[in-house]
């Protein structure tokens, strides 16, 4: 055994306690003092090391999606889509790929209850033979905003007041009163499904539009969806209060206990596809993340199944150090020009480097399971042992070569540099259609939640009026009911 390559594989591989450097500890109960009652000596390195390590146990919390739970499993292809993509993990029915999935709430802190009204993260990391693929989505198929320039401000508005650290409706509704594209997302968040019963009983969505590329180089727009085989279940407010009051980690425990009992959660992945040549045929922009694609025109097509059959065995390594980035794709899957997706391509990898360090992809949960090779060396917390002499490319002493060329989208882009909004905003049609699809009692609960939110005493008459105007444009009767209950007229 090479002692320079040896690393402990377990905390229990020594019969006695040791320091971090391996020295035996004969007393892990008492500090080193001058006499039985004298002062503690600074030279007690074991004490100093123990306290210093304890002081640094917690790593930086995620800015969003801090509260989460993870599980391992597999993705299996059940339907052939090789005509759409050259992605190796989608090459044929029956192919299985190991995955790790992280579910989360979005806005609230790491220890917050899992019964708060909040979107839920649904992120899947595929460990494919051609590298990792991160599909970083939510349980809702749309988002609040369509341009990443607004993302920091949006998160600030949703987070607690920086003065009082209290999350307040007036801040949220003030910000989004400037962004009517958020209405569609609010028809999900303020709906009954705004509080999922647990992680097993909720949908998943890739949210953004991605691109599939086949071996011939043909590109197809795609949206990814996950449907739970056990159905979607949610909590109404009264039950959410009871459940959260009894156990603030109820969804994490439900996921863990279900897998431990052999009741493996399963989802049916499906896709919607669209040829780029058809994107101008709709009354909305298909790359607008605040919109859904109509399923009657672009139906869901089954792809496979996702099964979670193994619990994680270390929360820090497999949940807190688990890092997802929409930029991590594989041959056959690519991005689109969705403005929010383009922003997340940079932002997510950047926040992981801040939170976990520049070598976060060496951590066990994030490292690819396939062979990999590059000349990315050193840096903070680099723990990969390498003994090569060649750390540059190309070299006649190193036989590594370029991989076989694989197709990427060949879209021709032209236009002038400008900062502008998209042409087809169409902010009110889909929110109105979704509201009208609710049953009368579901509509009533939706209205009641909005009345409560708009009744915040710090919300001005102007802001209430703007929101009623927005909802009136989505559905006239909805706007009238809100105006009547709040005694406010629309602003137009």
Swiss-Prot record:
Keyword entries, A-Z: Heme, Hydrogen peroxide, Iron, Metal-binding, Oxidoreductase, Peroxidase, Peroxisome
Which CDD domains does the UniProt entry name for this protein?
catalase_clade_1 (cd08154)
Q: Which GO terms describe its molecular function?
A: catalase activity; heme binding; metal ion binding
What would be the name of the gene that encodes this protein? CAT2
Q: What SMART domains is this protein classified in?
A: Catalase (SM01060)
Q: How does it assemble?
A: Homotetramer.
The UniProt entry annotates the active site at 65, 138
Would you tell me the protein name for this molecule? Catalase isozyme 2
Any keyword Phosphoprotein?
no
Say where the protein is mainly found: other
Q: Which GO terms describe its cellular component?
A: cytoplasm; peroxisome
Biological process (GO), any one: response to hydrogen peroxide
Q: Which cofactor does it need?
A: heme
Q: Where can this protein be found? A: Peroxisome
Organismal lineage: Eukaryota, Viridiplantae, Streptophyta, Embryophyta, Tracheophyta
Give the species.
Solanum lycopersicum (Tomato)
* SUPFAM superfamilies (alphabetical): Heme-dependent catalase-like
Q: Tell me, in a sentence or two, what this protein's role is.
A: Occurs in almost all aerobically respiring organisms and serves to protect cells from the toxic effects of hydrogen peroxide.
Catalyses which reaction(s): 2 H2O2 = O2 + 2 H2O
């Amino acid at each position: 055994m090479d002692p320079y390559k040896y690393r402990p594989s377990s905390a229990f591989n020594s019969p006695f306690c040791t320091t971090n450097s391996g020295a035996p500890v004969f007393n892990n109960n008492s500090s080193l003092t001058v006499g039985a009652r004298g002062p503690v000596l600074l030279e007690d390195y074991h004490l100093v090391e123990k306290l210093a390590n304890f002081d640094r146990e917690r790593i930086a919390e995620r800015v969003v999606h801090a509260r989460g739970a993870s599980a391992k499993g597999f993705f299996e292809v059940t339907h052939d889509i090789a005509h759409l993509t050259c992605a190796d993990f989608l090459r044929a029915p029956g192919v299985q790929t190991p995955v790790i999935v992280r579910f989360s709430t979005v806005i609230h802190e790491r220890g917050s209850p899992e019964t708060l009204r909040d979107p839920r993260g649904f992120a899947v990391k595929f460990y494919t033979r051609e590298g990792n693929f991160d599909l970083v989505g939510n349980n809702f198929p749309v988002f609040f905003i369509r341009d990443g320039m607004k993302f920091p401000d949006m998160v600030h508005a949703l987070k607690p007041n920086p003065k009082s650290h209290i999350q307040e409706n007036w801040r949220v509704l003030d910000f989004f009163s400037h962004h009517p594209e958020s209405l569609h997302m609010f028809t999900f968040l303020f709906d009954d499904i705004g509080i999922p019963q647990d992680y097993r009983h909720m949908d998943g969505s890739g949210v953004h539009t991605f691109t599939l590329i086949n071996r011939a180089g043909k590109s197809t727009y795609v949206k990814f969806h996950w449907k739970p085989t056990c159905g979607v279940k949610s909590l109404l407010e009264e039950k959410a209060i009871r459940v959260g009051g009894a156990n603030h980690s109820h969804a994490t425990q439900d996921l863990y206990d279900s897998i431990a009992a052999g009741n493996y959660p399963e989802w049916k992945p499906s896709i919607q596809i669209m040829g780029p040549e058809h994107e101008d045929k709709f009354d909305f922009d298909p790359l607008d993340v605040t919109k859904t694609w109509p399923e009657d025109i672009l139906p869901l097509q089954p792809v496979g199944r996702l099964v979670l059959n193994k619990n994680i065995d270390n929360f820090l390594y497999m949940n807190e150090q688990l890092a997802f980035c929409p930029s991590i794709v594989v041959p056959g899957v690519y991005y689109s020009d969705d403005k929010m997706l383009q922003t997340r391509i940079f932002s997510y990898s950047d926040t992981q480097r801040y939170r976990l360090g520049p070598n976060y992809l060496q951590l066990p949960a994030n490292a690819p399971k396939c062979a990999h090779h590059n000349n990315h060396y050193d840096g903070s917390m680099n723990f990969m042992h390498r003994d090569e002499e060649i750390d540059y490319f190309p070299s006649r002493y190193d036989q590594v070569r370029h991989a076989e060329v694989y197709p990427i989208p060949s879209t021709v882009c032209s236009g002038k540099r400008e900062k502008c909004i998209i042409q087809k905003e169409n902010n009110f049609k889909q929110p109105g259609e979704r509201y009208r699809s609710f049953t009368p009692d579901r509509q009533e609960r939706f209205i009641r939640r909005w009345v409560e939110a708009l009744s915040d005493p710090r919300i001005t008459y102007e802001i209430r009026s703007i929101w009623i105007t927005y909802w009136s444009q989505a559905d006239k009767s909805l706007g009238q009911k809100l105006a009547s209950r709040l005694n406010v007229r629309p602003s137009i």
